[in-house]
Amino acid sequence: MRLLQKFTRKSSLKQSGSSSNYAYVTARVRAMKSNLLPREVYPRLMNMGIDEITRFIEESQYKQDVDELARTYDGVDLFEHALNRNLAVTFTKLINISEGELNYLISEYLRKYDIWSIKTILRGKYCGASVEEINDSIVSAGQLSYPFLLSLSEKESYESIIDALSGTDYYPTLKEYDGTNLSDIENKLDKMYYTGLSTTVNNPKSNDSKLFSKFIRTEIDIKNLSTLFRLKNAGVEKDEIADLILEGGLHLSIKEIEKLLPLPFSEFVQSLEKYPYWEDISGIVKTEMDSLIELETQLTRSNIKSASSFSHVYPLSIVPIMDYILNKTNEVHNLRIILRGKAANLDEEIIRNQLVI
């Protein structure tokens, strides 16, 4: 099974001998996108009990994943693993059917799942989580295979985990981990990922690499905004916030962010009115905010909306593919939030505020 194979990139921009097959992949993606759950399904799911929701998932596009994992897992754990497996299979398929520059760009973007899984494993070990609890959150949609990630989660110490990753690009950062500085290492991994993406499309020449660059830089803006809101609202000092800021944003350059860092929270909020993201968050943002869940949900929605609008303008480019990746990721996120929330008997309003619809 392809999911169980450790794959590597099939091409790079430096050895881009093969041409990209955008028309073929975008046609496949259109068909795949038709299988995504319509918006109107989520309110129905919110009115269902946990048994009805699990039955709905069993009868959906996730059926094969549920069936294959039913011998190993049950209950909510089964559906957590089924969602993660489906996401991994879906994104691995995109890599397998793409060629040339397109394959390279997709592969580089999906490295985020390598970092997600590595951080999940290290944080799980740090918090004393069981192997089963760690494996619930592993997603093998990047370049590290599922069996390899499982082998990492089964290791006893963080040192042995890092040693096993010595042949990867992540090792130079991971070897700085001493068992106490996990947050710092997680931040460095995130910065490494986005720096790598920025380097991938540095001085983009093709139209698709330019579109990809805009997509990535918008995502960096969204992440920086989320970081600024969260930390400034918590009263964190500007120097500490600056260490967590990602470079390469589209509308929020480092110079722009440096102007925002010293501002009190209320002035920071007012200063955002001149940026294009203000239109999406103006109805939510206040000078005093107890919770940022709704804001972060809206920022994610804004990112998806931006990609969707561009996908209609450039139908035979990388944009519809990135749009699909965002929407597929969001579908799994929404289903997971509903399942977890219902299983934990959370108030419906709390669950609803975390859904990106």
Swiss-Prot record:
InterPro entries: ATPase_csu/dsu_sf (IPR036079), ATPase_V0-cplx_csu (IPR014272), ATPase_V0-cplx_csu/dsu (IPR002843), V-ATPase_V0D/AC39_subunit (IPR050873), V-type_ATPase_csu/dsu (IPR035067), V-type_ATPase_csu/dsu_dom_3 (IPR044911). GO terms for cellular component: plasma membrane; proton-transporting V-type ATPase, V0 domain. It is a peripheral membrane protein. Keywords: ATP synthesis, Cell membrane, Hydrogen ion transport, Ion transport, Membrane, Transport. GO terms for molecular function: ATP binding; proton-transporting ATP synthase activity, rotational mechanism; proton-transporting ATPase activity, rotational mechanism. It comes from the Archaea. The keyword Cell membrane applies. Its main location: membrane. GO terms for biological process: proton motive force-driven plasma membrane ATP synthesis. Transmembrane segments: none annotated. It is found in: Cell membrane. Has multiple subunits with at least A(3), B(3), C, D, E, F, H, I and proteolipid K(x). HAMAP family: ATP_synth_C_arch. Component of the A-type ATP synthase that produces ATP from ADP in the presence of a proton gradient across the membrane. PANTHER family: V-TYPE ATP SYNTHASE SUBUNIT C. NCBIfam families: AhaC, PRK01198.1-4. Belongs to the V-ATPase V0D/AC39 subunit family. This is A-type ATP synthase subunit C. It comes from Methanococcoides burtonii (strain DSM 6242 / NBRC 107633 / OCM 468 / ACE-M).
